[in-house]
């Protein structure tokens, strides 16, 4: 997704809302994504029969970024401080310690953290990570939440 203006290439601005949901933790879970580029929107969702809320929050972000086919300027709204702080703050120490926490314990969800890290570092996206309070009336977050719940229903075999 690039725009060419006067012979120069600029990155397209994309707004993304992500959310994860889990019925039981662990239990059946879902993830939802709302991507918006100008007036164009795309919705994505999926689920797993046995997972955790944090894994679904991470999967939503991974699926959102993987859906972008070219480097973009991304404003990514998420209601998970675990994911936002993990990718912007904690990951540097984890990598330096061989994917271990400061307490020397293995990082939870390391498979997803490594996938997310690879997407963020190799994609060329410029990402502005913005936390939004969940279930507080933000229209984009509410839509991502509804999509995540559709993912739960799919994981349960109801969709």
Curated annotation (Swiss-Prot):
Domain RNase H type-1: start-end pairs: 10-153
CDD domains (alphabetical): RNase_HI_prokaryote_like (cd09278)
Cofactor: Mg(2+)
BP terms from Gene Ontology: DNA replication, removal of RNA primer
Record: residues binding Mg(2+) 2: 19, 145
Record: residues binding Mg(2+) 1: 19, 57, 79
Keywords: Cytoplasm, Endonuclease, Hydrolase, Magnesium, Metal-binding, Nuclease
MF-aspect GO terms: magnesium ion binding; nucleic acid binding; RNA-DNA hybrid ribonuclease activity
Signal peptide segment: none
GO cellular component: cytoplasm
Known catalytic reactions: Endonucleolytic cleavage to 5'-phosphomonoester
Cofactor binding summary note: Binds 1 Mg(2+) ion per subunit. May bind a second metal ion at a regulatory site, or after substrate binding.
Enzyme Commission number, as recorded: 3.1.26.4
Subcellular location(s) of the protein: Cytoplasm
Quaternary assembly: Monomer.
Function text: Endonuclease that specifically degrades the RNA of RNA-DNA hybrids.
Family membership: Belongs to the RNase H family.
Alphabetized HAMAP family for the sequence: RNase_H
Name listed for the protein in its UniProt record: Ribonuclease H
Organism: Polaromonas sp. (strain JS666 / ATCC BAA-500)
